[in-house]
Amino acid sequence: MIEISNLTKIYGSGPQEVMALKEVSLSIRKGEIFGIIGLSGAGKSTLIRCINMLERPTQGTIMVDGQDVGSLNSLELRRLRQKIGMIFQHFNLLSSRTVFENVMFPLEIAAVPKNEAAQKVNALLELVGLTDKAQVYPEQLSGGQKQRVGIARALANDPKVLLSDEATSALDPQTTRSILGLLKDINRKLGLTIVLITHDMNVIKDACDRVAVIDDSTIVEVGDVLNTFSNPGTPTSRSFINSIINREIPAEILHRQVIDHGSNSSRLIRVSFIGPSAGEPIISSMVQKYAIAANILYGNIDQVKDIPFGNLTLELIGPVNTINEALDFLRKCGLEIEVLNHAGN
């Protein structure tokens, strides 16, 4: 649906030159919710604004639904933009117009007949849950309701793509969840491709199918959201994930002095699990089968798209050979094992 190749955006020149994007390449599939996360100034908003040419890239190509966006003339670009809706952190509603009239506005610009446009607006207000607010003015709405109006307005021309630039960052957590739920519902009902810019990993976890992590103007990781959460591949990804799920083992546990257990060995391990294995008594089965002790020191669990994932830090106590056999058993059960430290006789 969207193919971005070697995209670079430079502002200014000479000593004032700033590289906002550096050789960015992405492939966004039709019908998915694709998240782009990064810190302030990383380049994520510049990237999304290049997709509909609100920002012209310095070099590189952007293909949207088979069209090279950068090669379009003014008329062609205007037509393409009608098929790319956009919502923002600030709602940009017209204060002198009612909710109905705000949603009607892009249809007026497109010269859609009034009766047809009115039917369209009513359907959109029903979709976003604002039928009873049609004749209300923006100042009478909550932040979440204003964003719902913005979403309805962005959908007025039946876009194929919806761009969301920090659309929930000004909202409280409960309202954010409500708006994300609406976007997922729209994605499911309309088959709409959604590109979602955020600095909040909770937004990625709750709404997205795949995610790209941008750091210092460059894409550093792209992947399925579940895989990124369960096995982040870069320090930037780990930092974002740790902001909502602490995957890092506390130092006092990691550097724990292994206790002398006489003739037995002691080994500190981290066990990572994902999907069905999270609900199975694998650790209990290991303890019973190999007659070793397992001391649970630390752990956490969470869900992405109703799939559980997490990790446990365990101290295993027993004969060296038996512990090795137990670790092989865990691996055969599909668990990822990391040995943190060990001691033994």
Swiss-Prot record:
<feature type="binding site">
    <location>
        <begin position="38"/>
        <end position="45"/>
    </location>
    <ligand>
        <name>ATP</name>
    </ligand>
</feature>
<keyword id="KW-1003">Cell membrane</keyword>
<dbReference type="InterPro" id="IPR003439">
    <property type="entry name" value="ABC_transporter-like_ATP-bd"/>
</dbReference>
<dbReference type="InterPro" id="IPR041701">
    <property type="entry name" value="MetN_ABC"/>
</dbReference>
<dbReference type="GO" id="GO:0005886">
    <property type="term" value="C:plasma membrane"/>
</dbReference>
<keyword id="KW-0547">Nucleotide-binding</keyword>
<dbReference type="GO" id="GO:0005524">
    <property type="term" value="F:ATP binding"/>
</dbReference>
<dbReference type="InterPro" id="IPR045865">
    <property type="entry name" value="ACT-like_dom_sf"/>
</dbReference>
<keyword id="KW-0067">ATP-binding</keyword>
<dbReference type="GO" id="GO:0016887">
    <property type="term" value="F:ATP hydrolysis activity"/>
</dbReference>
<dbReference type="InterPro" id="IPR027417">
    <property type="entry name" value="P-loop_NTPase"/>
</dbReference>
<comment type="similarity">
    <text>Belongs to the ABC transporter superfamily. Methionine importer (TC 3.A.1.24) family.</text>
</comment>
<dbReference type="InterPro" id="IPR018449">
    <property type="entry name" value="NIL_domain"/>
</dbReference>
<dbReference type="InterPro" id="IPR017871">
    <property type="entry name" value="ABC_transporter-like_CS"/>
</dbReference>
<comment type="function">
    <text>Part of the ABC transporter complex MetNIQ involved in methionine import. Responsible for energy coupling to the transport system.</text>
</comment>
<protein>
    <recommendedName>
        <fullName>Methionine import ATP-binding protein MetN</fullName>
        <ecNumber>7.4.2.11</ecNumber>
    </recommendedName>
</protein>
<keyword id="KW-0813">Transport</keyword>
<dbReference type="Pfam" id="PF09383">
    <property type="entry name" value="NIL"/>
</dbReference>
<dbReference type="Pfam" id="PF00005">
    <property type="entry name" value="ABC_tran"/>
</dbReference>
<keyword id="KW-0472">Membrane</keyword>
<dbReference type="InterPro" id="IPR050086">
    <property type="entry name" value="MetN_ABC_transporter-like"/>
</dbReference>
<feature type="domain" description="ABC transporter">
    <location>
        <begin position="2"/>
        <end position="241"/>
    </location>
</feature>
<dbReference type="GO" id="GO:0033232">
    <property type="term" value="F:ABC-type D-methionine transporter activity"/>
</dbReference>
<dbReference type="InterPro" id="IPR003593">
    <property type="entry name" value="AAA+_ATPase"/>
</dbReference>
<keyword id="KW-0029">Amino-acid transport</keyword>
<comment type="subunit">
    <text>The complex is composed of two ATP-binding proteins (MetN), two transmembrane proteins (MetI) and a solute-binding protein (MetQ).</text>
</comment>
<keyword id="KW-1278">Translocase</keyword>
